[in-house]
Amino acid sequence: MIRRREFVGMAAASLATAAWPGLPVHRLIVAPYLFIPMDDAQSEHLKAYGVAYRALQRGERVEWLINYRGGAFLLPGSAAAARDAALSGVTAQPVDDGTVTAAKAEIAQGNMDAVPLEKAPRVAVYAPPTAAPWDDAVTMALNYAGVKFDKIWDAEVQGGRLADFDWLHLHHEDFTGQYSKFVLNYAGAPWLTDMISQNQAMARSLGFANVPADKRAIAQRIAGFVERGGFLFAMCTATETLDLALASDGVDIAAAYADGTPMDPAASQKMHWDQALAFENARLEQSPTIAVFSDIDGHQVNSPDRRQPLGSFTLFNFSAKIDPVASMLVQNHRQVIPDFYGLTTSFTRRTLKPSVTVLADEPGAPWVKYIHGERGQGTWTFYGGHDPEDPQHQIGDAPTDLSVHPHSPGYRLILNNVLFPAAKKKELKT
């Protein structure tokens, strides 16, 4: 019978041989470093992020090798790291000092960099207590990779809990307080009835007259979290509606079913775009029956006459040594990725603030997919769409099984965002 310890050692040797077949097996068990490739040699791209994250949790030094072997990771050659990689099915290779020195010499000569990661970020996901684990792609990615997180919602945000975290994720929350504008088209559906009841009860418990007022206050708290140095990552509806909520202070942008009064017909002209993170000069959707919020979204998936077909988006190349943050956010083993729908699928170029960094777009299209920027001492990153491996995303679809998509380039972008707050800030020479 093979003991567990022997199995782990055999697994580590096998995986390392797959990473670099020429290395003798007797050198694979003990070495100063553990190298995790992130190119096509990797057998489990998504779980590799979890291995790096847990090494940081143990207080180990991790380096992110930007633009080298698909954005590889270099860990100490500890027994804990080797065991974790083996049990996670992650391709990992013990390497010696000479191998690392040669790799870093190559990195120094090209558009690459070795970025030290200092500590595991404290992660929070903003979601209702009753949200299922498969309700958003980030929750699924975190669970699959083995990254621990806390779930928080309005009461925790209003209670100051954001200060306990470094990184916050938002997904399909509608910060305009209109229940994703599903009310008229899905009236009577049990899931919608529960959503409305839960949100109304929360708003009342926090002293707000209605859900739109509650969500606007939550959006302002989240913006304050970023200003004080927090890292915000949002997808799908949360991207667009967060900015609409921030820019609509004193402006009624909600339908009557949400706050008892109709939307101000002149709302688009009254918005305070200086308060928004990413967008400006958007035109709001006036119809309460169309599940579209504004022309920020380029694909308009729920507007029959404006809906755009899916294509693919291309990740931009950045200077790893000069622009390490943008470079970290686009690390991947693929540069062109199939697009996927969400209530907010993409971001029109026309509505982007000049300060926004575009990380990925559909070449030649009037929209982009993946953007980044700063607010105060912190940063935000917006990624359009709901689930990279569920391109059409219909209500009631079965949850995505990430074990079927361990190499998903779309999901890798999510996990890049989880790790980049751990990076040691580098002073640039001027």
Locate the predicted segments by residue.
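A glycine-rich, often tryptophan-bearing local segment used as a flexible ligand/cofactor-contacting loop or short
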Residues: 181-317
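Extracytoplasmic/secretory-pathway proteins
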Residues: 109-113, 167, 206-209, 421
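N-terminal export signals
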Residues: 6-22
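Hydrophobic targeting/anchoring helices
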Residues: 25-136, 145
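Catalytic beta-strand/loop cores that center a nucleophilic Ser/Cys/Thr
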Residues: 136, 143, 240, 270-395
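Extracellular ligand-binding/catalytic regions of CAZymes and related secreted enzymes
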Residues: 25-37, 44-74, 252, 351-430
